[in-house]
Amino acid sequence: MSQYETPLFTALVEHSKRNPIQFHIPGHKKGQGMDPTFREFIGHNALAIDLINIAPLDDLHHPKGMIKEAQDLAAAAFGADHTFFSIQGTSGAIMTMVMSVCGPGDKILVPRNVHKSVMSAIIFSGAKPIFMHPEIDPKLGISHGITIQSVKKALEEHSDAKGLLVINPTYFGFAADLEQIVQLAHSYDIPVLVDEAHGVHIHFHDELPMSAMQAGADMAATSVHKLGGSLTQSSILNVKEGLVNVKHVQSIISMLTTTSTSYILLASLDVARKRLATEGTALIEQTIQLAEHVRDAINSIEHLYCPGKEMLGTDATFNYDPTKIIVSVKDLGITGHQAEVWLREQYNIEVELSDLYNILCLITLGDTESDTNTLIAALQDLAATFRNRADKGVQVQVEIPEIPVLALSPRDAFYSETEVIPFENAAGRIIADFVMVYPPGIPIFTPGGNYYTRKLRVYS
């Protein structure tokens, strides 16, 4: 089939045109059985393809027809041997990767700055995480990728690990030398699992970091909805044969997936793949140019800083994605959280993320020059508004806490008897649940972690 075809979406449209009389779920029956206000807002076409896995429409759990064709086209587009559609988000795809290679007691090498879904899968599988410390940027106060040296050390000390998980690129857009990491892991016959939640587009442009499949990784959870144009909660899992059992992967993702599959989400993956495969390079080039214009404009504003190519040169910052706009506001004497609230209240601008020192804005295929000009004007106003704080020497100090050490396995801690105590009394106690801020969904506290007074003060 051609990458210009959309077998899943096209079949859904043809099915809706036949207008069959439905005596199956969903009970709203093309919108007729739901609140009219919502029906009018969503629209007839969307509700007409809100369908389930009846015989003419294939079955995500055992695809043989239009879903299989759509997944095969996605595999070809991303350079995978197999692609599985996920309507459980990239979290579901990440959990599938971990649970496909790990069982109770198995070791898995992971960066400490992994997403909650990785730790959730570790709890479900009973695996033992071996943390690799990411490189920390003392100027921005953010985590980058893992270094080649940390990977070498982890592999030498834990050559019996069942998998190595890598984030590529990070939430902030930085990438390590993934190809070399893959080669290292494969020399130990250890499969490489890639959290590619923020990198669906990198496969389709040569100036962006190397994608997981291009680097030879074994599995990659790739979030099409975040940056690739599909609907929220839709994602894909790309798999290469060899070190992983594809049938087992399919069984795990089926186990984690609802049987009431959303065909709207599946169709959005089909059409997003078509656009990326056929127009992606040109569209992403426009997006990069737009982002670089924004970066240059921000760096001309006093007391603001937007990192770019000058950050490259370490093992953990081998390459970067310029469409991620990090704006460091600490030299204004304010926090990223304050900047986020100010932009919302003054300019009706919503950013992707804020932390103590930065805000993060994503430039995607959906942005326009008008939108980015508004952002630039807003940041100029922000800098002017808080310039007095900067001139007075008010500074936000970057303080990076130590990475906690596990006292128990995450699974043992999670399923242990627990008690709720005041936060200030938690020093020396073992955490039983996740504590995190979303976005990005990286656990601050992880089940099994032992926390001390200084760590608690910094995290608070």
Curated annotation (Swiss-Prot):
Catalyzed reactions: L-arginine + H(+) = agmatine + CO2
Family to which the UniProt record says this protein belongs: Belongs to the Orn/Lys/Arg decarboxylase class-I family.
UniProt cofactor(s): pyridoxal 5'-phosphate
EC top class named in words: lyase
EC number: 4.1.1.19
GO MF entry, a single one: arginine decarboxylase activity
Record protein name field: Arginine decarboxylase
Coiled-coil features, chain-numbered ranges: none
Pathway it works in: Amine and polyamine biosynthesis; agmatine biosynthesis; agmatine from L-arginine: step 1/1
Residues carrying N6-(pyridoxal phosphate)lysine: 226
UniProt cross-references to PROSITE patterns, sorted A to Z: OKR_DC_1 (PS00703)
A biological process from GO: spermidine biosynthetic process
Entry keyword annotation includes Phosphoprotein: no
InterPro entries: Orn/Lys/Arg_deCO2ase_major_dom, Orn_Lys_Arg_decarboxylase-I, Prn/Lys/Arg_de-COase_C, PyrdxlP-dep_Trfase, PyrdxlP-dep_Trfase_major, PyrdxlP-dep_Trfase_small
Subcellular locations according to the entry: Cytoplasm
Pfam families hit by this protein: OKR_DC_1 (PF01276), OKR_DC_1_C (PF03711)
Keywords assigned: Cytoplasm, Decarboxylase, Lyase, Polyamine biosynthesis, Putrescine biosynthesis, Pyridoxal phosphate, Spermidine biosynthesis
